[in-house]
């Protein structure tokens, strides 16, 4: 059983229109992706120094690794928190850390956009086995995409194609233990579309069953949350953040 009491249940989160799929993306700063801030600029400089190559993908991989090392995974609830604030706190949720990665990308001139997914709350049951009744009915997930060359690359395939990641780690992502969605990107296939399913069935890393709705693509996560709201209503975010904001995701 999941809860809708703490969510903005009055919002009608409808599937994306055909036009929503045309989101052009951007590299401009936003309230969340405040890449002009000195903390984001410092992370960009460090990522450039740590990158194994000179390409844009190498830069993003280095930034991802640095964020994993420097920003502790916690159950923070404010998806609209700026990237610079997350860096200052040195802790953040998967959503907040993905926003930091996006901010670094934009700071480097790499356009980004997000795909909005409405994910079933049961996906997070393994994290909160004794608090299932408080887990939101659905979670609004902003899943980044990066413009690398002439194509958009989803964050799920930043390290390698889903097939290659699946072969390397057939167990898939279980949403348990210390590996969060953010860390999983480096070694595990995260398949929201069921694209890895074949004639003989679906793989263990197919997560399409927990996707309630595809909200479409937006030029920024700011636009997604403005259109569909965050997972929890403001009072719930404040109360929940005070209780869970420092709790490690493990």
Task: Give, region by region, the residue ranges found by the protein language model.
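His-Asp-centered catalytic microenvironments across diverse enzyme cores
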Residues: 2-10, 15-24, 32, 119-250
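Secondary-structure boundary elements
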Residues: 3-89
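Generic hydrophobic/packing signal
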Residues: 44, 60, 96-98, 102, ...
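Residue-level signal for well-ordered alpha-helical scaffold segments within enzymatic catalytic domains
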Residues: 65-66, 103, 107, 146
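Active-site neighborhood of thiol-dependent amide/isopeptide-bond enzymes
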Residues: 77-135, 139
């Amino acid at each position: 059983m999941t809860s809708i009491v703490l969510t903005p249940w009055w919002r009608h989160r409808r599937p994306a229109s055909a036009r929503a799929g045309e989101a052009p993306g951007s590299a401009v700063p936003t309230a969340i992706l405040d890449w002009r801030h000195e903390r984001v600029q410092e992370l960009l400089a460090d990522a450039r120094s740590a990158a194994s190559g000179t390409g844009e993908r190498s830069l993003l991989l280095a930034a991802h690794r640095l964020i994993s090392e420097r920003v502790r995974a916690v159950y923070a609830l404010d998806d609209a928190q700026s990237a610079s604030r997350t860096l200052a706190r040195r802790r953040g949720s998967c959503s907040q850390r993905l926003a930091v990665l996006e901010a670094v990308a934009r700071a480097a001139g790499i356009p980004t956009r997000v795909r909005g997914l409405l994910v079933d709350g049961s996906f997070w049951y393994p994290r909160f086995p004794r608090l299932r009744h408080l887990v939101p009915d659905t979670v609004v997930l902003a899943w980044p995409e990066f413009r690398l060359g002439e194509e958009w690359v989803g964050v799920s395939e930043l390290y390698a194609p889903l097939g290659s990641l699946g072969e390397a780690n057939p167990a898939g992502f279980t949403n348990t233990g210390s590996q969060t969605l953010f860390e999983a990107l480096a070694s595990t296939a995260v398949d929201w579309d069921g694209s890895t399913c074949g004639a003989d069935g679906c793989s263990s890393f197919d997560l399409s069953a927990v996707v309630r709705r595809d909200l479409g693509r937006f030029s920024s996560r700011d636009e997604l949350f403005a259109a569909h709201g965050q997972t929890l209503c403001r009072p719930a975010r404040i109360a929940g953040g005070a209780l869970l904001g420092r709790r490690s995701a493990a």
